[in-house]
């Protein structure tokens, strides 16, 4: 692990979005005591997808996570529902929906997914992080991102969410693709909503009301209530069709000039972070505040109420989520050339 100051994609995104958020998360190291369900779901799903792609037993991994979480999962049952059971159901359906030969995973140093990296991108600044996976379809090569969602992002959102293309440069620097170049990003979407449970009518039959659910859930309810599957073929078929709502892979081609443009912007942000870490904490109020972990603190500050009480009640100090991230220290950076066609001299 490098002793030089590090910058990650999450740090850059937070810095650009709201410096107050960055200050809370990466300078004060505040974290919510209770993780929101979407984040908890996404983290666990990432863990078992890693095991799945690497050829291990995802359900064994899920059982380990449940054992480790033990009491915490029990305490959150009323608020989140049985998140472990939901993840198991959704993952098994995902595995059936997308067989392993639906794409070709490109291994890196014998590993199929979750590729950690640490590379000096500016003299004195290290970029670190983790790439979900690399894959190929036909003759095209893609950088893969696992994304869990509550509402599927549309194309208008996806074209704005291009920050992951900075990983293109990292892969080139590391030489993981040889002479090949990426054609774009593969978004591997998985719906995080717990499948709805079909209702049983007074006569013992299954309600035909349309639900967003999955076939295995329908079959389980039918089995538990002694309902013959031949009597509910329409319900099962609808549930099978709804798998498309749960699992989508969308491939977004990326222009090489866009990669250089975003990369150079990332370098500028990295320099800003190193120069101003702990010094700037301007609040940027906007729609993003609705889902920001630190909204309660900012709201209390704006209303003139006790922020210390909010912090003590709802937050704790933790090291950064990525164990390899370190607190940036100011350096005098010298720019590394981002591309042969776009050379800029050093300077912050």
What are these regions (language model features)?
Residues 1-348:
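RecB-family 4Fe-4S metal-dependent nuclease core
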């Amino acid at each position: 692990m490098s002793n030089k100051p590090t910058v990650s994609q999450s740090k850059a995104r937070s810095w650009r979005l709201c410096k107050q958020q960055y200050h809370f998360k990466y300078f004060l190291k505040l974290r919510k005591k209770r993780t929101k369900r979407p984040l908890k779901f996404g983290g666990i799903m990432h863990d078992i997808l890693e095991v799945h792609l690497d050829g291990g037993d995802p359900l064994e991994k899920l059982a380990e996570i449940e054992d480790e979480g033990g009491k915490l999962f029990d305490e959150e049952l009323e608020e989140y529902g049985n998140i472990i059971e939901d993840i198991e159901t959704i993952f098994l359906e995902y595995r059936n929906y997308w067989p392993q030969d639906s794409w070709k995973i490109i291994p890196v140093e014998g590993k199929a997914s979750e590729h950690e990296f640490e590379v000096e991108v500016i003299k004195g600044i290290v970029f670190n992080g983790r790439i979900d996976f690399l894959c190929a379809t036909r003759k095209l090569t893609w950088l893969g991102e696992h994304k869990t969602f509550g509402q599927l992002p549309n194309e208008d959102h996806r074209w704005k969410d291009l920050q992951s293309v900075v990983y293109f440069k990292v892969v080139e620097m590391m030489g993981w693709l040889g002479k090949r170049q990426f054609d774009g990003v593969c978004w591997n979407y998985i719906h995080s909503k717990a499948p709805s449970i079909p209702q049983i009518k007074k006569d013992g039959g299954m309600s035909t009301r349309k639900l967003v659910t999955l076939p295995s859930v329908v079959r389980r309810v039918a089995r538990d209530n002694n309902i013959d599957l031949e009597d509910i073929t329409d319900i099962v078929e609808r549930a099978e069709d709804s798998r498309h709502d749960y699992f989508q892979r969308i491939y977004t081609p990326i222009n090489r000039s866009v990669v250089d443009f975003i990369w150079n912007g990332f370098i500028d942000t990295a320099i800003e972070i190193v120069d101003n870490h702990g010094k700037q904490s301007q609040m940027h109020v906007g729609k993003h505040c609705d889902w920001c972990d630190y909204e309660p603190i900012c709201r209390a500050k704006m209303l003139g109420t006790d922020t210390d009480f909010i912090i003590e009640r709802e937050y704790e100090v933790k090291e950064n989520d990525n164990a390899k991230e370190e607190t940036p220290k100011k350096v005098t950076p010298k720019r590394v050339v981002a591309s042969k066609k776009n050379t800029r001299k050093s300077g912050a």
